[in-house]
């Protein structure tokens, strides 16, 4: 089963300059065309509990699809590297001349979906999780059609983890 996921950062009480340092506010998930859920931290849901749940979902998913996996690894526990699919890397391989690979672009290019730029962060996290889920199959099919699947699977995906580890170790 394919699971799309996205990190929601709680940036409401943080200056824009420090938005990347904001605390984990929640995680959005999508595993069907009909439903996307955002689980927020706060109240009875601690960040630690949420991360445990994410770990279980990630480990058991057939494919765990996110945008910008290298940055997601810093926020979410990734125990099963073999089932990860980085939609950003896939989009890059399909169009290496672009300067950025935002989920909004993938939504438009792969799904014909326009994302409301004025949506709040919570809504955007849900859109990102949905786009990760829904775009996985078309991205994979296009990678196979362009003979880039083996490059993606055998070189690019393992490299994401290597680059993350290099950044962590200095």
For the regions a language model picked out, list residue spans one by one.
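A basic/glycine-biased coupling hinge at the interface between accessory DNA-binding modules
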Residues: 111-114, 118
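Mixed-charge, glycine-rich, non-catalytic linkers/tails in nucleic-acid processing enzymes
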Residues: 78-79, 106, 118-170
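Conserved RNase H-like, two-metal-ion catalytic cores of nucleic-acid enzymes
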Residues: 1-110
């Amino acid at each position: 089963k394919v699971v799309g996921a996205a990190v929601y950062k709680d940036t409401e009480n943080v200056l824009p300059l420090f938005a990347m340092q904001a605390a984990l506010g929640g995680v959005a998930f999508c595993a069907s065309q009909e439903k996307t859920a955002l689980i927020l931290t706060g109240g009875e849901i601690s960040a630690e509990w949420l991360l445990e749940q994410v770990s279980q979902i990630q480990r058991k998913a057939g494919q765990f699809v996110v945008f910008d996996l290298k940055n997601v690894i810093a926020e979410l526990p990734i125990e099963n590297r073999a089932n990860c699919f980085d939609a950003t890397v896939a989009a890059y391989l399909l169009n290496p001349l672009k300067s950025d690979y935002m989920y909004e672009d993938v939504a438009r290019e792969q799904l014909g979906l326009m994302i409301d730029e004025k949506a709040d962060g919570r809504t955007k996290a849900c859109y990102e999780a949905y786009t990760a889920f829904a775009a996985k199959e078309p991205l994979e099919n296009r990678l196979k059609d362009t003979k880039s699947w083996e490059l993606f699977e055998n070189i690019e995906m393992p490299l994401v983890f290597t680059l993350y580890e290099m950044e962590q170790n200095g």
